[in-house]
């Protein structure tokens, strides 16, 4: 029996077998490490790499391409330099530096790459957003008009902050800058504001202390802490604020409110200077690179109040595809950058840069701090350029003259040191000023609801505290607010709901205060 080979049968068998064959080969664009050290790697090859693209080095070390030169790529390493050596192969990832975002991030401590560092397991998120993104254009924004209450009397009365504003907290070391930011985060409880605290170049123990404080006051449930401590590589400290802005933008663009604290941007500028000098970029003033202003301006411009018109918001520039279906209007991102000055020098390079970018500054002074005035805010040079339109009517009414009264008090106080014979009017003005200074003092981690602030500042500016002994002002405040809460809660509720201080409410408040002052003075006779 002869066997005949049929060509069509052979070709059909081959087709079937070839159809089941899958090529296992994967093509990567790779380069070679030429030189490595101080958190910087020079890589040969990678001719198609993009600026800001993530690179994969051996031993699970990630890096980012920053300098695209003619014959090599300057990359910063996000891990230990000693794990990378000359001749190692570097892979392109074709992914721009990005972090995972979502509600699952709340209550967690992460590094600037979005990896959890609190030992509570992995974070389940569906969306990744790029670290770098252009700020929303003018037509997608709305002017700041809603208040962001800090719970601090001195700030909410004289330097009000609105949702979508950038307000700088500036001062020497150990003047309470972080305390102001943490109090603001604690005060957002129940107000629908998601908070992001970015720790840049702080000690690990300081970050742990902040996390413990936020947990103690139940603030971690709506807060994410992004930490790049002093022991982390400089490139991680440089990208940390961008990670915070990206997470905040997720809440902003989905129609919610977010607050991001950058603590502090001086250390980010130092980290960026270190990276730039190692990459051989030309130095400028104080050895900072020429684009250090742009580093901070492109970061802080991302804080914005977004238009309520959802159709306009959906057309926002640079909107990542992952967010397009989730966009809602009316969201906001408020930024509180922190800057540390040296010996109160606000005219140094980085402080003046950030002052000119932000919408105002809260200046904290060591002299005031050491004299017992806390928060140690220098009202004279602190300002909020857009917050006035966000302040509630009641506060605007009672605190209208507060700044002027305090300025006059400071001036008279300086003059009164020269002579003892003061006329009645001057003495009365000094006495009232001293009481106003006293009522603006506040303990740490005890933010005050705005309606209580209105009540106590009303008493101070109306002169109802003029006869109360200065030593007992704090005690008076405590007992008076306690009385309002227990017996006259309807007054506080009315101020809180309407946001205004009606004439009848003011009259009732005055009446209660006059009676209480008499009782209090009788009880606390020296």
Curated annotation (Swiss-Prot):
Pfam families hit by this protein: ATP-synt_ab, ATP-synt_ab_C, ATP-synt_ab_N
The protein's role, per its UniProt record: Produces ATP from ADP in the presence of a proton gradient across the membrane. The alpha chain is a regulatory subunit.
Record bears the keyword Membrane: yes
Protein family membership: Belongs to the ATPase alpha/beta chains family.
PROSITE patterns associated with the record: ATPASE_ALPHA_BETA
Identification of the protein by name: ATP synthase subunit alpha
Residues of the site described as Required for activity: 382
Subcellular location as annotated: Cell inner membrane
Positions that bind ATP: 171-178
Subunit structure: F-type ATPases have 2 components, CF(1) - the catalytic core - and CF(0) - the membrane proton channel. CF(1) has five subunits: alpha(3), beta(3), gamma(1), delta(1), epsilon(1). CF(0) has four main subunits: a, b, b' and c.
UniProt cross-references to SUPFAM superfamilies, sorted A to Z: C-terminal domain of alpha and beta subunits of F1 ATP synthase (SSF47917), N-terminal domain of alpha and beta subunits of F1 ATP synthase (SSF50615), P-loop containing nucleoside triphosphate hydrolases (SSF52540)
Entry-linked InterPro entries: ATP_synth_asu-like_sf, ATP_synth_asu_C, ATP_synth_asu_C_sf, ATP_synth_F1_a_nt-bd_dom, ATP_synth_F1_asu, ATPase_a/bsu_AS, ATPase_F1/V1/A1_a/bsu_N, ATPase_F1/V1/A1_a/bsu_N_sf
Species of the source: Pelodictyon phaeoclathratiforme (strain DSM 5477 / BU-1)
GO MF entries: ADP binding; ATP binding; proton-transporting ATP synthase activity, rotational mechanism
Reactions catalysed according to its record: ATP + H2O + 4 H(+)(in) = ADP + phosphate + 5 H(+)(out)
GO terms under cellular component: plasma membrane; proton-transporting ATP synthase complex
UniProt membrane topology term: Peripheral membrane protein
Highest taxon, organism lineage: Bacteria
CDD domains (UniProt xref): ATP-synt_F1_alpha_C (cd18113), ATP-synt_F1_alpha_N (cd18116), F1-ATPase_alpha_CD (cd01132)
Transmembrane segments: none
Enzyme class (EC, first level): translocase
Keywords: ATP synthesis, ATP-binding, Cell inner membrane, Cell membrane, CF(1), Hydrogen ion transport, Ion transport, Membrane, Nucleotide-binding, Translocase, Transport
EC number: 7.1.2.2
